[in-house]
């Protein structure tokens, strides 16, 4: 088995330099890190922990790389994936990036060194080129977010249609001042959800300035709280909100409850995702329901099939879940207004 001493002898550097370079120590120059990693890859070096994993049998570990396990959306996916993979003799390993592409790269380096069987990833907005190369060398698929450089295997939600449907419901109720709180456009999911929001406004014959947008970290409850606080204090207060992530929804609901805002009498709200508490929050939250369990199960089955059949190359595969609008009591025509004819 190749050791750090072998790499050091090949490159003419010390063993400690090799170890620090592989650990991404900031004291080592980028040029030296590159030379060490390249030599390690060429020589088939496996790190100490990976070596322990690899003694005996080949890896049966599949990695799930996500932004934040505290987001119940991702924790539910992790649970369903783990359950399905365990039934097939595989184990799920979890890595969190906090939507930081450097953290993403660090995890992918480790996963590659550990020779995991495959990777399921919710990619950051702009993965490093090295991350792309590492993933291309592993069986992988993208989940929810889709980055063109990472291949064409993807499981996700029709984000455009989900937000178009949610916004169209508010337009049909007669709202003309609608605010959208969602993730940044640099994220594929954020861009598609914003596009769906704007599509519904256009289809409803509303002018561009009928919709206000507040884009920010999709996993930040604080962003939801601060944004809705600002919207309610400013001029031309919206009569309706449509939300583009679960964490933003949680933050908004917390702020509305704290301020005593009457929903839907003073403000209509359409959330995102369908957490257990959403059905009994206030009048019951109208929200975009997502088939998380079904999507995770399909994702696990695809990966298991891919690992067991080991095709010579992966053809494109896309699975799009439509989502649904769950109607409850948090939406109504604006005060002094009325729903359009045929509104749900």
Model-derived features: positions:
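Alpha-helical recognition/docking segments in bacterial nutrient-uptake
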Residues: 2, 60-168, 172, 233, ...
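N-terminal helix-turn-helix DNA-binding module of bacterial transcription factors
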Residues: 1-60, 338-344
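Short acidic/polar active-site loop segments enriched in Thr and Asp
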Residues: 14, 60, 117, 175-178, ...
